[in-house]
Design a protein with these regions (language model features):
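C-terminal helical cap(s) of enzyme catalytic domains, especially alpha/beta-barrels
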Residues: 123, 257-279
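Active-site beta->alpha loop and helix N-cap motifs at the rims of alpha/beta catalytic domains
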Residues: 59-140
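Glycine-rich, proline-tolerant flexible connector loops at the mouths of alpha/beta enzymes
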Residues: 43-66, 191-194, 253-256
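Conserved, mostly hydrophobic/aromatic
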Residues: 30, 37, 48, 113, ...
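Alpha-helix-loop-beta-strand connector modules within alpha/beta enzyme cores
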Residues: 9, 56-84, 149-155, 208-218, ...
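N-terminal small/glycine-rich loop or linker at the start of catalytic domains
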Residues: 1-22, 117-129
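Active-site mouth loops of central-metabolism enzymes
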Residues: 13-32, 85-95, 135-140, 220-229
Length: 310
């Protein structure tokens, strides 16, 4: 019998309040919306803070994530949470871009890391225009970077959320699995580009192409549409019927309406129930992923040294 479906909520990304008045940006708003949406059926939560994706140092703040996550973990100690990371650029090592991910995992917070196993150009281009010269939308991760992120995820006993922006990314994951070095709990996130120009468009044929690569890996997988609506376009329904899971949220959404995260989660829940399934609980999501058990942690004190709060 088909099992429960994981709903991942991507709370905010780079979406601003000017673009959608409902998007949570402060740590307290992030915590509140995450908790409310978890009650509605979300079992994985992903958020950004206000650091830009392209920075001079590549560093993101640990303290900002702790401020947002602590209320969630107080209510749900086994919650599955993961941050973003700064985009790669020449001269900025992965150790800097991934430092906050590593520190959160070291503390046992969230239970997940993220691994983006390759490089990709991502840009918002419309009307058939050519991307402008000097565009900074190149997201770079070398083979060495990927090795670092997978190896540290395994050492930290954290489940990697693996972002697939191009089909070749799946082949890199397959190499790690074949070598027996893919960390436990890995989940494949298939990202399709609607308004954002990268990878494959959100069509049934594109999903089939991905599944030809993904299904032999026998890993849990989900679908997301960047710059679109994964439910409205029909991709979520096809994915669920094929055994996949779904990601929704204001990081990804683009459409004619101005929904809240709550409305997007409810939309996913309705679809799942119409298909005779149910949303996964946190415990069920952990079981589906095969994620390592949640490690105990204490409340994080308000003060800490520079390394811990960077």
């Amino acid at each position: 019998m088909p099992g429960p479906v994981i709903i991942e909520l991507a709370l905010n990304g780079s979406t601003t309040r000017d673009q959608n008045r409902h998007v949570p940006r402060s740590p307290s708003d992030i915590a509140d919306v995450a908790l409310e949406c978890m009650e509605l059926g979300a079992s994985i939560v992903h958020n950004h803070n206000d650091e830009p994706m392209f920075t001079e140092t590549g560093e993101h703040s640990v303290a900002s994530y702790i401020a947002a996550w602590q209320p969630i973990l107080d209510r749900h100690p086994d919650a599955l949470l993961y941050p973003t990371m700064a985009a790669g650029a020449r001269g900025i090592p992965v150790e800097s871009r991934w430092a906050h991910v590593e520190e959160l995992a070291r503390r046992g917070l969230g239970g997940m890391t993220l691994v983006d196993p390759g490089s990709v150009n991502i840009g918002l281009v419309s009307g058939g225009c050519v991307p402008p010269t000097g565009d900074q939308g190149c997201y770079q991760n070398t083979f060495d970077d990927v090795a670092y992120m997978f190896s540290r995820s395994a050492e930290l006993h954290a489940a990697p959320s693996i972002s697939i922006f191009e089909p070749g990314f799946v082949r890199i994951v397959a190499m790690w699995q074949k070598a027996g070095k893919l960390p436990p709990g890995a989940v494949i996130k298939l990202f399709f580009g609607a308004d954002l120009q990268f990878g494959l468009p959100p069509t049934p044929t594109a999903l089939e192409a991905y599944l030809e690569l993904v299904e032999p890996l026998q890993l849990p997988w989900s679908v997301a549409v960047l710059g679109g609506d994964v439910v409205e376009c029909g991709l979520a329904e096809i994915a669920i019927c094929r055994g996949g899971h779904v990601r929704v949220g204001l990081e990804d959404y683009a459409g004619g309406a101005e929904p809240s995260n709550h409305e997007l989660v409810r939309s996913a829940v309705r679809l799942i129930e119409q298909l005779g399934r149910k949303p996964a609980t946190i415990a069920e999501a952990r079981q589906i992923l095969g994620a390592p058990s949640a490690r105990p942690f204490g409340r994080i004190a308000g003060s800490c040294n520079v390394f811990e709060c960077r």
